[in-house]
């Protein structure tokens, strides 16, 4: 098994990142290639999961180990494949997905891309007891930052733009609406 790769990002194409590790180039399927753009021609550590199925052998990759752990949990759900699991992780924060599972919020889960009500119910049923193993505890500032990013995405901004803007303007004691206002000003420049 390959747990992680440390190498230089050669290129990014069609949801895949090509990483050069000692002159061996690995093709890694990633959810949001925008997260990797800043690493082109730079070294990066990517946490990976090798998946063997009818389509062949594939490597799925994440910049954060917590996303890898959530991916592993999700692909363990009956009838939920790696592509669907990747869509779930790419479309929302780990914290909000875990929170929806813990709170048995089938409606929130079924609003995610490619997830219908039956699949959402199956995710809750199969993961509600084990998902708590993921340490996704977040402090108040981080919670506000995540909520501000989600608000900006809802308003139509690209997730990467929203992350960059919120992280740039958020101060420790800011209220959520202040963070959003500052980020909107930053994005309108």
Swiss-Prot record:
Residues 1-63 are annotated as: Domain I. SUPFAM superfamilies: DNA helicase RuvA subunit, C-terminal domain (SSF46929), Nucleic acid-binding proteins (SSF50249), RuvA domain 2-like (SSF47781). The keyword DNA-binding applies. Its main location: cytoplasm. InterPro entries: DNA_helicase_Holl-junc_RuvA_I, Hlx-hairpin-Hlx_DNA-bd_motif, NA-bd_OB-fold, RuvA, RuvA_2-like, RuvA_C, RuvA_C_sf. Has three domains with a flexible linker between the domains II and III and assumes an 'L' shape. Domain III is highly mobile and contacts RuvB. Belongs to the RuvA family. NCBIfam families: ruvA. This is Holliday junction branch migration complex subunit RuvA.
